[in-house]
Design a protein with these regions (language model features):
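Active-site neighborhoods and metal-handling regions in enzymes and metal-associated proteins
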Residues: 1-464
């Protein structure tokens, strides 16, 4: 596979003023509750306890459309019982966005410090657990953020990432033997409910990817030598939609090594490294590379980094598909890109995404996780080779079979047109021959600008 660079008309797109915050129909959430309770029944569990806070909201949000913002919340589910949601002072009013009937209980310990604590606060948990029928013979599945595996502890299935005071209170009722970590119900690569999306969820992620990629493109197009990181970050033109992570902008080699550094006062210089990462909720787009227009200075970088890195991305995109395992993708990349091991790639070459930026990854050499219909995936390979600039392309996509594609096209025709345009650009301009089931969410999907001061040049597969 020969790699070249081609000149294109600089990409330009209108800004979209549409919110990624969507509350679905009641039936959607109730169906999800039914599915997760079916998983609980198979495990012999009587109740599910789902915890959320500002950072770890996605599992609760999946069942309610609600996130607790700067407070905490606890959802309790059981067969044949109305769901019960424990909330802080400010969450009680906000939770009225939930579109179906459930019991909401004020638990002021989930509020911020210094706010009102009524005398009966001490009794709230006991009463709530009793209302939901939790008793010594109950078996509880606890869902926080992570599940654990044997490599992390001999008692991995009773390792919990919920606050200790909640776990302790439940343990007083059912003992430790009556509890199990079942966050895997949500994000296990093989069966987790949030690892595959329906047509409406895909539409949200496509919208988020569109808005995010256009912000990143706007950022790149406005860069000029001498601009500071914090000034340049304003080029993202962020609206009020919730973000998936803090925006990353830095212009120094040290900043690249730090990876997640927020923008500071460093100024952009020609021939320096430029790094940007940004995402609205359910999306992330990132670019790292050289800010230069003088390619003659960087023949070594072209030969030893840019060409093999882009070739690796082409292999990644052309290999993924429904039924392909993540292990197959990794093994093919390592087999065909001898530079892989010297690129300093410390994380999985790709991962799954939902409302949170990284739910789990199927891209591992140790397990055979098949890519499935409805999966939302981040193409995300971070290279940090010694003696060369960092390199990072990250964009999101989904896999959809013919039926799911037809449903999406019918229900979301404008989004489908954007996807079709991106697919054509990847195949015709970049030379990346993706499969029919690959639905790109980013307007700069696979676009590698080798010289970031000139966005009219992109890398491509040489068709000759």
């Amino acid at each position: 596979m020969n790699i070249t660079q081609v000149r294109i008309e600089p990409l330009q797109f209108e800004r979209l003023h549409e919110s990624v915050v969507k509350v679905f129909a009641p039936e959607t959430y109730l169906s999800r509750i039914e599915k997760v309770l079916a998983l609980a029944k198979k495990e012999g569990l009587t109740h599910l306890i789902i915890y959320a806070d500002r950072e770890h909201f996605a599992n609760l949000h999946y069942f309610t459309g609600f996130d607790p913002r700067f407070e905490e919340a606890l959802l309790i589910l059981a067969p044949d019982k109305k769901p019960l949601l424990l909330l802080g002072n400010e969450g009680v009013l906000y939770a009225t966005i939930i579109p179906y009937d459930l019991d909401m209980v004020l638990f002021q310990s989930f509020s911020l410090n210094g706010q009102q604590r009524d005398p009966e606060t001490i009794e709230v948990l006991d009463k709530a657990f009793n209302q939901m029928g939790i008793k010594p013979t109950s078996r509880l599945g606890l869902i926080g953020w992570k599940y654990f595996i044997p490599a992390e502890g001999k008692t991995y299935d009773t390792m919990f990432d919920l606050p200790h005071f909640l776990v302790e209170k439940l343990e007083q009722i059912v003992t430790l033997k009556g509890m199990k970590n079942v966050a895997s119900f949500m994000v296990d690569p093989s069966f987790g409910l949030r690892t595959t999306l329906d047509v409406d969820e895909i539409a949200v992620l496509e919208l988020a990817g569109t808005k995010t990629s256009r912000s990143v493109l706007n950022f790149l197009s406005k860069l000029k030598p001498g601009v500071s990181e914090i000034e340049a970050s304003s080029y993202l033109e962020i609206d009020g939609d919730p973000l998936i992570a803090h925006p990353v902008v830095n212009f120094t080699a040290e900043g690249i090594r730090q990876g997640l550094a927020s923008p500071g006062s460093h100024k952009l210089q020609l021939d320096s490294v430029c790094n940007v990462g940004f995402g609205y909720r359910s999306s992330m787009v990132a670019r790292t590379g050289l800010y230069t227009s003088d390619s003659a200075k960087f023949k070594k970088v072209w030969d030893e980094l840019l060409v093999p890195y882009f070739r690796m991305m082409v292999i990644w995109y052309e290999t993924i598909g429904i039924g392909v395992t993540g292990k197959t993708v990794v093994e093919r990349i390592k087999r065909e890109i001898p530079e892989f091991d010297s690129f300093g790639i410390g994380l999985n070459p790709g991962h799954l995404i939902h409302n949170d930026e990284w739910t789990t990854s199927v891209f591992t050499e140790t397990d055979d996780f098949p890519l499935r219909n409805g999966m939302a995936i981040q193409s995300d390979i971070i290279a940090a080779p010694v003696g060369l600039p960092g390199m990072h392309l990250e964009d999101g996509l989904a896999l959809a079979d013919s039926q799911l594609r037809a449903n999406f096209k019918e229900k979301y025709p404008e989004a489908w047109q954007r996807i079709e345009r991106r697919r054509n650009f990847m195949k015709e301009v970049l030379g990346i021959q993706i499969k029919d089931e690959v639905l790109p969410f980013s307007d700069i999907q696979g676009c590698m600008f080798p010289w970031m001061a000139d966005l009219g040049i992109v890398m491509a597969v040489d068709k000759k």
